[in-house]
Amino acid sequence: MEKLKPRTLSGFMELLPAPQQKFERMLEILRKNFALYGFTPIDTPVIESAEILLAKGGGETEKQIYRFQKGDSDLALRFDHTVPLAKYVALHENELCFPFRRYAIGKVYRGERAQRGRFREFYQADIDIIGDGKLSVVNEAEIPSIIYKVFSEFGLKRFCISVNNRKILNGFYAMLGLTEKSGDIMRTVDKLDKIGPDKVRVILVEDIGLSQQDADEILRFIAIRGTNAEVLERLEAYRGRDEAFDTGLDELTTVTKYLAAFGVPEENFAVDLTIARGLDYYTGTVYETRMLDHPEIGAICAGGRYDNLAEYYSDRSLPGVGVAIGLTRLFYVLDEQGMLNPDLLTAPADVLLLPMTDDFTAAVELATRLRNAGLRTQIYSEQKKFKAKMTYADKLGIPYVVFLGEDEIAQGTCSVKNLRTGQQVSLSPDEAVELIRKGISELNKGSVILEK
């Protein structure tokens, strides 16, 4: 029989065990920190009714969605966690307690053209806070503060969370008499870092129909730079000319104040008027996070405030604020840039227990003792030469090997070898547990990411 050649579809990430362990460490950090801020996990179906997922209309979403028929059912794979959240909240609005704080970490699917760093199946991590009728602006500062904490624990140092408010942009465009074109202008401005100011100017004038003067005025406005305090002070000069602008400026000032109170250093967040977010459902504060030494990567995390989350499924006003991290792409880019910590413990076990007798009873009892102490333990039960057993431990990167032979069993001891240092000692089981636990604690101190 002819054998099929195994292959993985283009645009789907499949990791070997060691990098998978690093990816799992990132997931652990996310879950731990999201829980620390009082978020509850939810898991929505990967497959939904196409009608539900496409409630906001077609466009680019419909082009990218994985859609199929099963009998009479028109189905689709979720393409993000936001639309399923809207359905979830509308469906369970009478059972949920508001403000509802949830996180979702899972795979989403988009039929994008496969290319370097772009995936058709990828992990996305979302956090959102949903209010009932109202939602305090304080939440709009707490969300990016969580991102700061998560990225810092990943090991990233040189990153910046850019913050803006769409009410400021809408208000400014209204001052220029461009309210009807504000959506098109924002989507164009959102491409600034990809295509540059000259091409943005061309699109504003030739495609959207702005005058050269208005296009230049917009580019001058979004180019305002300085410290956060300096940018806010320059924006004060526009106050009093548009109500939406004034509201947005008040909100942005409050968000920057609370970001500092949440412990986010000024070098890690900046008021940036170029941030617009292309999606129309954002109504207030918007964010994008970038790595300062790798601007070519683009945004590694983005989100913002929205006031009509479930408008297609419910008449209830459910404002919210949230952010999403494209984990698969972030991990791919970090790996490609050589920024994943090569010394991070990626072994599937802390201890490999090598029984040196035919009877495994003592080995099983010791393994149980080690596991009860929280140490991940494998028993090597294959009848192979000693060298092969040690090679197995070495290839997997297991840091400790415990030998248990007739002499050790008779004396109530075991031999513990640290494969990283080569040191070997004879200890009681309790002493072995303590030694290994301390060693593993030290090995686990490293971060997932090492910035160069």
State where each predicted segment sits.
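Glycine-rich, mobile lid/loop segments that gate access to catalytic sites or pores
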Residues: 161-171
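Auxiliary tRNA-acceptor-end handling modules of aminoacyl-tRNA synthetases
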Residues: 1-20, 69, 179-182
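Acidic, His- and aromatic-enriched active-site or binding-groove loops in soluble protein domains
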Residues: 63-72, 178-200, 291-293
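Polyanion/phosphate-binding surface patch
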Residues: 42, 46-75
